[in-house]
Regions:
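ATP/NTP-dependent adenylation/nucleotidyl-transfer catalytic domains that generate, transfer
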Residues: 1-181
Length: 181
């Protein structure tokens, strides 16, 4: 009998298979909803992150929240506030919250920006990013970097990403799938 994460991931994989079949039947392209924060650290289930294109795959989670607020401010409440303010969760187990498994997204995104795209930020932006990173426990910081390194094999199997940032996964950043971390 499967237990824990292995059992939880069955639900996500079945959902992916169902959605791909439904998309196929309708003759439509399935869109992957993964984002750069989750993709970076492998916080997704293989074969649940399927699709023909990942529209928001190069946006950090904090950027997605900002984009949602911007859309609502400029076009009316298209995205219900309950969706934006809902605690992020993979919803594979009761009371599951992304930030309990990882860390609050502003801190995670700061670590990822430093690791992936540091040279593309202005000095002022780098100071803001560094200020957030300075608040992170060094062990948690190291854990996030380890997750980043270990997730390459998952990213290689994900839907193609529309590149927004200077360094997107895929063509913008390639490292061996298997390497010593």
């Amino acid at each position: 009998e499967l237990k824990g994460v292995a059992a939880e991931n069955i639900q996500a994989r079945v959902r992916g298979v169902f959605l791909m079949a439904y998309s196929n039947q309708l003759g439509n392209l399935m869109i992957c909803t993964g984002n750069k924060s989750e993709n970076s650290v492998g916080y997704f289930t293989l074969w649940d992150n399927c699709g023909g294109m990942s529209i928001i795959g190069d946006l950090y989670k904090t950027e997605i929240f900002d984009l949602c607020y911007w859309i609502n401010e400029n076009y009316g409440e298209i995205i219900p506030l309950e969706i934006i303010t809902k605690i992020p969760s993979a919803e594979l187990a009761p009371n599951m919250e992304d930030e309990k498994s990882l860390m609050p997204y502003p801190y995670l995104d700061a670590i990822l920006k430093q690791e992936l795209e540091w040279e593309y930020f202005s000095i002022e932006e780098q100071k803001e990013i560094q200020a957030l990173i300075d608040e992170v426990d060094p062990k948690e910081h190291a854990r996030m970097l380890k997750l980043l390194d270990r997730a390459e094999f998952k990213r290689q199997q994900s839907a193609p990403i529309i590149r927004i940032h200077p360094r997107a996964f895929g063509n913008g950043r390639k490292i061996p799938i298997v390497h010593k971390c």
